[in-house]
Amino acid sequence: MDSRQQRPQRKTLQWQLAQEQRQQSPPQGLAVASSQPDTKSKPQDDLQTQDWVCEPQELRRPGSRWNISIDERRRLALQRMQERTDTARAPSGDPLGLHPEGQQTETSPSTQSVPTPPLQACETMADPLQDIAHVLAELMSEGVERDVLISQPLRSTENSNAFQDFLAQDAPLWKDENFEAQTSRWPHS
């Protein structure tokens, strides 16, 4: 008997066993009830729908599924990407959070940007500052802190100078074409 014929018999036996256990004793909690098929339906219905394996409706978020095709995943990913770019481009008084809450500026309807698809958005943005502002606004809309995105002035140049000195010392080593010959002279650990 091959595995395709064994599976329905096994499911039927499990269903019958569950029926007998329920008749002998009351249910022992949610673990038994959630792992077994519904006792009111026929075994054939349970084998076809397998409702006990599917995601419970009360836990399901809108638009989410457990079993989803690759094409559907791609479509949803493109849809989410479009929604993100639309929300990042949505006019707000202070997309970068640079003004205090009470001092946000209003945008006029003539200056509001019209949402465009992501590929066209990259082509139409010629100004690098506009690109940077767009990326910063998008990152902030995703919850990245403003302090992380906008660099602070250096408190001390000592660290920067020490790093530059270190790079200057090792520059001849890395620029030298005989790097392999130099490494062969070093003792191996």
UniProtKB/Swiss-Prot annotation:
Residues 1-120 are annotated as: Disordered. Keywords: Cytoplasm, Cytoplasmic vesicle. Its main location: cytoplasm. Residues 14-24, 103-114 have a biased composition (Low complexity). One of its GO terms (cellular component) is acrosomal vesicle. It is found in: Cytoplasm; Cytoplasmic vesicle, Secretory vesicle, Acrosome. Residues 70-87 have a biased composition (Basic and acidic residues). Mainly expressed in spermatocytes and spermatids in testis. This is Testis-expressed protein 22. It comes from Mus musculus.
